[in-house]
Amino acid sequence: MGDILGLVAKRLGLGLVILLIISVIIFFMVELLPGDIAQAVLGQGATPENLAALRREMGLDQPAIVRYLTWLKGAVMLDFGNSIVTGASVSQTIGTRFANTLFLAAYAAAIAVPVSIILGVLVALARNSIFDRVANVVTLTSISSPEFFLGYILILYLAVKTGMFPAIASLREGMDFGELLYRTFLPALTLVLVVTAHMMRMTRATIINLLASPYIEMARLKGTPPWKVIVKHALPNAWAPIINVVALNLAYLITGVVLVEVVFVYPGIGQALVDAVSKRDFPVVQAACLIFAATFILLNLAADVGAILTNPRLRHPK
């Protein structure tokens, strides 16, 4: 147990260092963008006195390092200031949008994870068959297709031509859970098509590799039924790489959802980021980017911990 806690602590410490470095990059990349924030807020007709007063109010008259430390302190307390465009709290705005993104990611994961594992095992058992070749072509096509392309294809056939689902994933207060699932089905399906292909191929490769192991051959020679060979002998040793790839794809579901949210006009954090960039709402841009980075690092940490817990060789590296 001590070895596991030590490894987790090292991963956590490394993640915090990486997040700190990313926070520096995010802040100063925004600082380097052309234009004057005060001018953007007040407009071209603002007087020099009003511009100077707003710069003092926003702390723009202070050195960049001082402003970074102030912003970082607020970020640690989940206080990202106020939106330049709306004046609303960035934390509240981003919090609502992030909750919507988490729901969409969870919706897609609930479908993609079991489907990809089951299909990966079936394809591995039917290696080199027609089913395997068809699955290989379909997954490669899905992986190579951009998310926005898949999204527009689904909109064309499932929304425009058939009218089965709405083309825009609009949400409203008081919506019941069934309607919520219905309205967000197309963006969730778009994400499912992308991540299922990745996870299915990894599961297939892992199972095929394990089926060639000596202990699997021994189990077969003993007359163990094929399903029992998979469930009792192959899957327990396949969980480490499978859990790792699942966690990494969950990270993608949250951080790579921007294009999907834009295509379906879904009110998530990705859509908020795009809107903020177009309106030069820098506090929202900084907050959204930092949340994306923190989420990705956290899920990578979860992948590392899952791999450690399911692989004895990682638990006892010596």
Language-model region placement:
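Hydrophobic alpha-helical segments of integral membrane proteins
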Residues: 4, 12, 50, 54, ...
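Residue-level recognition of pore/gate-forming positions within transmembrane alpha-helices
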Residues: 15, 23, 45, 140, ...
